Curated annotation (Swiss-Prot):
GO biological process, one term: chloride ion homeostasis
Organism name: Homo sapiens
Gene from which the chain derives: SLC12A9
Effect of residue 552 to K: Found in a patient with a neurodevelopmental disorder; uncertain significance
Topology relative to the membrane: Multi-pass membrane protein
Cellular localization per UniProt: Cell membrane; Lysosome membrane
Family note: Belongs to the SLC12A transporter family.
Protein name: Solute carrier family 12 member 9
Length: 914
């Protein structure tokens, strides 16, 4: 965790002039020794070559011939608009911080997290691997179109034998050449790319000059077989030179049959071919680990490359429409050779473009693979790809990728691979747009890119357009890619990954939570929508684990805050001892699988700390309304960490960098007879403080005896039938008659009903006990209670029990604390009443027999026992001197009752209105 002494920047401000100092953690290809490429050689050249590919020479006639000039320009504008949206996102992310090796993968993973970044990074890697194979297969086909021997044998220039084995051999030889260049490092790759760029530029220049310099001519088209295999007379296309009639004829669309496939073209199919050729905008970003200044080079170089290729495509569209008739455009996609002043130069351009695309894909794939291996997302599978040379060249990743490309070449399915490659590229582009969109929506202060020509609108459009293009190009491949991404993300989530990168999801959640918390107006609260919002005060969680889980069940969709008071005075301490404890408590919440917030405080006493937490815990309209405490008794604390399966062994203890076991982060339970942090006086005072602050109070006793299946997160399926007993009457001072249920009694009913909504308690039966005096007739009070339960939609079994004279039922209502502030006679009566009430409750639980005076004959020892008992918690006496006596009465009342919740409610929580 960063401290006051941590540097604000990850590099030294003072250093040797003109020397770039790497950020912490940069190594390998991201280190200073490997950063050699300029903007032009590292970004512009590979991006231009990738965006041209073979389309610029072999598909211009296809697009213009079928779509016409106007629709072709519209397609080009739409395609580049989609790409430009992603380019804007790339520029924004690249100028917001130091970009290391891995290009698009690095940007996505450091924004969306390792799960999404790793899954898309692997898919982008596979796309580059397949893209390299597609380029090589296309190059082999182009070579064999000119130099391949036909069925009659070699003749003239057609001397190369053909067939699957020969094609695989040619592809493997070309792959060896490409792999050798990439293995020797980025420097040789940059020089080879620059040489290729010169060849392609020279070839394009010769084509552009030929459009102007060559006069009109007829060009013989490839003959087509006629019906029944008969030969047709030769057909010719016409190069007219600059002619307005030719332009007019080529303005509109004229979709026809593709002579290479026999399929009739339409707007979508032509647009897909054009868009396939325009992808490749990440070629420069993939070299981020070798760039001298990636934050400047990536945006500048990518924008220049996109603008340059767009201009060349537009120029070629216009020149083709002005000079070539539709027959030539539709029947001879390689017509550039026929009109060129020197046709071999066009062939050189075609071969150089395909070769450069394969080199760009292979070296880009190796850099992505090395970044994935360095981040250790896929474990030992990619471990060999971490190896680099002394100069930082990831040669092992190149060889790794070379082997995969060789496997793809064995398949030889060019057309199938092309669609999958494009879809995988689009998934990566959409993820980059989503990353930028997330950063923009999160409104984090540290997201301030120097490139400002973007907004959330452009990012959102980029995501939507990339997804649309995926399904337009290949619906099957698009659906499969999204499914694969989901499976990989699930795998990485299950495996776990580094958490030090930061998650934009956390920033987005903060932004949304803050917005909705501001809308949560406490002045609009209504009892219809009341829900429990609990503050559980815990001294040592090792002894309170069952209560921790029980409180999690009682909250039922409400707020749950886990509070702890550390004793001390900040004036006498060198630092705050509370802050280092948060990690341990958050790990406790994760391991216990409870949905709780953690709030810790430092205070000279537990009582004052509880007051602090009651006042300041929560935020806005989400503040605790109920205090939950463990019961204060002399029972020795149990160490539940030793018996609970979730805590007996540290999770992920075998993973490098995993946190230590929780048993080492919390002290052992208090030994019997040792001093306690809280005395009985302060304990009762804390209860009184909560009631004064208008908070409900729940005291939990013997929660460790709860059946384990009732504390589980499952459905609570068990062969043992349990009861949940509710006594909605103050057993220490019955008042108001047998049918009286006050606000506190209704709160008991509500909490018991909420517990029954939890799956683990579905099978437990709710029983409500109605106490009658020895002279009261049964039936009438039960009917009134059943009517009340019906109005409150509470399903429960009502049982009437007869209590003896000591209950005092039906006495006039008086001050609640009267029994505790009167003479000694009141204490004696209260003690007797507590013993009588305890015997009565025990008799109904099936835990024993013998009620108080005039009590029942005994409980049903053969029937189901009570898993949990809800009792009415009397208000503490007004005189603090009587707090210990009050606590002693509560101890007598709940002695040997098993798991018990003493509940006192101060606010209405039930409503019969719609």
């Amino acid at each position: 965790m960063a401290s006051e002494s941590s540097p604000l920047l990850a590099y030294r401000l003072l250093g040797e002039e003109g020397v770039a100092l790497p950020a912490n953690g940069a190594g390998g290809p991201g280190g200073a020794s490997a950063r050699k490429l300029s903007t032009f050689l590292g970004v512009v050249v590979p991006t231009v070559l990738s965006m041209f590919s073979i389309v610029v020479f072999l598909r211009i006639g296809f697009v213009v011939g079928h779509a016409g000039l106007l629709q072709a320009l519209a397609m080009l504008l739409v395609a580049y608009f989609i790409l430009a949206l992603t380019v804007l996102s790339v520029c924004a992310i690249a100028t917001n911080g130091a970009v290391q090796g891995g290009g698009a993968y690095f940007m996505i993973s450091r924004t969306l997290g390792p799960e999404v970044g790793g899954s898309i990074g692997l898919m982008f890697y596979l796309a580059n691997v397949c893209g390299c194979a597609v380029s090589l297969l296309g190059l082999v086909e182009s070579v064999l179109d000119v130099f391949g021997a036909d069925a009659t044998g070699p003749s003239g220039l057609r001397v190369l034998p053909q067939g699957y084995g020969w094609n695989l051999l040619y592809g493997s030889l070309l792959l060896g050449l490409v792999g050798g260049v990439c293995t020797l490092g980025a420097g040789l790759y940059a020089r080879a790319s620059f040489l290729t760029f010169l060849l392609v530029s020279g070839s394009l220049a010769s084509v552009l000059i030929s459009f102007v310099a060559v006069g009109p001519r007829d060009i013989r088209l490839t003959p087509r077989p006629g019906p029944n295999g008969s030969s047709l007379p030769p057909r010719f296309g016409h190069f007219t030179g600059f002619n307005s009639s030719t332009l007019k004829d080529n303005l509109g669309a004229g979709y026809a049959e593709d002579y290479t496939t026999g399929a009739v073209m339409n707007f979508a199919s032509v647009f897909a071919v054009l868009f396939n050729g325009c992808t490749g905008i990440m070629a420069g970003a993939n070299m981020s680990g070798e760039l001298k200044d990636p934050s400047r080079a990536i945006p500048l170089g990518t924008i220049v490359a996109v603008a340059y290729t767009f201009f060349v495509y537009v120029l070629l569209f216009f020149l083709s429409s002005f000079t070539c008739d539709r027959t030539l455009l539709q029947e001879d996609y390689g017509f550039f050779r026929a009109i060129s002043l020197w046709p071999p130069l066009v062939l050189i351009g075609i071969y150089a473009t395909a070769l450069s695309a394969s080199m760009s894909s292979l070296i880009g794939a190796s850099r992505i693979l090395h970044a994935l291996a360095r981040d250790d997302l896929f474990g030992v599978i990619l471990a060999p790809a971490k190896v680099v040379s002394r100069g930082g060249n990831p040669w092992a990743a190149v060889l790794y990728s070379w082997g995969l490309v060789q496997l793809v070449l064995l398949a030889g399915k060019l057309n199938t691979l092309a669609a999958v490659v494009t879809v995988f590229y689009l998934v990566a582009y959409a993820a980059v747009d989503l990353s930028c969109l997330s950063l923009e929506w999160a409104s984090a202060p540290n997201f301030r890119p120097t490139f400002s020509l973007f907004s959330w609108h452009t990012c959102l459009l980029g995501v939507a357009s990339c997804l649309l293009m995926m399904f337009l190009i290949s619906p099957g491949a698009a659906g499969g890619s999204l499914l694969l991404m989901g499976l990989l993300a699930a795998l990485l989530t299950a495996r776990g990954g580094p958490s030090s990168w930061g998650y934009v999801s956390q920033a987005l959640l903060f932004h949304q939570v803050r917005k909705y918390l501001l809308r949560l107006d406490v002045r609009k609260d209504h009892v219809k929508f009341w829900r429990p919002q609990l503050l559980l005060l815990v001294g040592n969680p090792r002894g309170a684990l069952p209560l921790l889980r029980l409180a999690n069940q009682l909250k039922k969709g409400g707020l749950y805050v886990l509070g702890h008071v550390t004793l001390g005075d900040l004036d006498s301490l060198p630092s705050d001892p509370v802050q280092p404890q948060y990690g341990a408590w958050l790990s406790l919440v994760d391991r216990a699988q409870v949905k709780a917030f953690v709030d810790l405080t430092l205070s000279p006493s537990v009582r004052q700390g509880a007051q602090h937490l009651l006042r300041i815990s929560g935020l806005g309209g989400m503040k605790p309304n109920t205090l939950v405490l463990g019961f204060y008794d002399d029972a020795p604390p149990q160490d539940h960490f030793l018996t609970d399966p979730a805590f007996s062994e540290p999770a992920d203890s075998t993973r490098e960098g995993s946190s230590p076991a929780l048993s080492t982060l919390f002290p052992p339970p208090r030994a019997p007879g040792s001093p306690r942090a809280l005395n009985p006086q302060d304990y009762v005072a804390t209860v009184a403080d909560a009631l004064k602050m208008n908070k409900n109070v729940v005291l939990a006793r013997a929660s460790g005896a709860l059946p384990p299946e009732r504390l589980s997160r499952g459905s609570g399926g068990t062969s043992q039938l349990h009861h949940v007993d509710v006594w909605p009457l103050n057993l220490l001072r019955p008042r108001g008659g047998p049918g009286y249920v006050d606000v506190c009694g209704l709160f008991l009913l509500q909490m018991a009903t909420i517990l029954g909504m939890v799956p683990a308690w579905h099978s437990a039966r709710l029983r409500i006990f109605l106490c009658l005096g020895p002279r009261e007739a049964p039936g009438a009070a039960e009917g009134r209670l059943r009517a009340l339960l019906s109005q409150l939609r509470i399903r429960a079994e009502v049982q009437e029990v007869v209590w003896g004279e000591g209950a005092g039922a039906g006495e006039p209502e008086a001050e609640e604390e009267g029994d505790f502030v009167n003479s000694g006679r009141g204490d004696a009566e209260a003690e007797a009443l507590a013993r009588s009430a305890n015997a009565l409750v025990r008799a109904q639980q099936g835990r024993g027999t013998g009620g108080g005076p005039g009590g029942p004959e005994g409980g049903d020892a053969e029937g189901p026992i009570t898993a949990l008992t809800f009792l009415y918690l009397p208000r503490p006496p007004a005189d603090p001197a009587r707090y210990p006596r009050y606590l002693a009465l509560l101890e007598t009342l709940t002695r040997d009752l098993g798991p018990t919740l003493l509940v006192h409610g101060v606010t209405p929580v039930t409503c019969t209105d719609l």
